[in-house]
Amino acid sequence: MINDILKDAENRMKKSLEVLADDLAKIRTGRAQPDLLAHVTIDYYGVETPITQAANITVLDARTLGITPWEKGLSSKIEKAILTSDLGLNPTNLGDSLRVPMPALNEERRKELVKLVKSETEAGRVSIRNIRRDANGDIKELLKEKEITEDQAKKAEDDIQKITDKMIAQADALAAKKEQDLMAV
């Protein structure tokens, strides 16, 4: 019972970390990264499809992405999707491929993005703490129903706290890496 609660809490915390990592990946740094375009979609035969599933995205240099669609007719759709996304990128259509230069970030924009990283990270921490609260509530419920002893409950709560501390440290590490990427000129 206790192991099930611990495993469930840890799995849910890992999912929260994955969501945080995805959210942080969407924040544009000055460097070219293919996963930046992962959430941009195009209409591909009537289905909203991520660009990553309709084209090959490569890093040409530190500030330029190359996009080679798997079908020639998709270049204009991909260009339009990137232009209408909230990324502030201007792709260049070369006919059978696209080039997407990454504009340099000014200091003010970098600071705004760092604030955004901090708020996303705090939301991730809150999510992890809520999972801890739920798990501790489940432990207290078992104790109330006399299915476990007080010592078992205390040990389980300590284990949940250790898992929580580990996950929050991972969230902080993700945020620190993203902030470092943002502040690098």
From Swiss-Prot:
Responsible for the release of ribosomes from messenger RNA at the termination of protein biosynthesis. May increase the efficiency of translation by recycling ribosomes from one round of translation to another. It comes from Francisella tularensis subsp. tularensis (strain SCHU S4 / Schu 4). It comes from the Bacteria. Keywords: Cytoplasm, Protein biosynthesis. Pfam families: RRF (PF01765). InterPro entries: Ribosome_recyc_fac, Ribosome_recyc_fac_dom, RRF_sf. The keyword Cytoplasm applies. GO terms for biological process: cytoplasmic translational termination. GO terms for molecular function: ribosomal large subunit binding. HAMAP family: RRF. Its main location: cytoplasm. GO terms for cellular component: cytosol. Transmembrane segments: none annotated. SUPFAM superfamilies: Ribosome recycling factor, RRF. It is found in: Cytoplasm. This is Ribosome-recycling factor. Belongs to the RRF family.
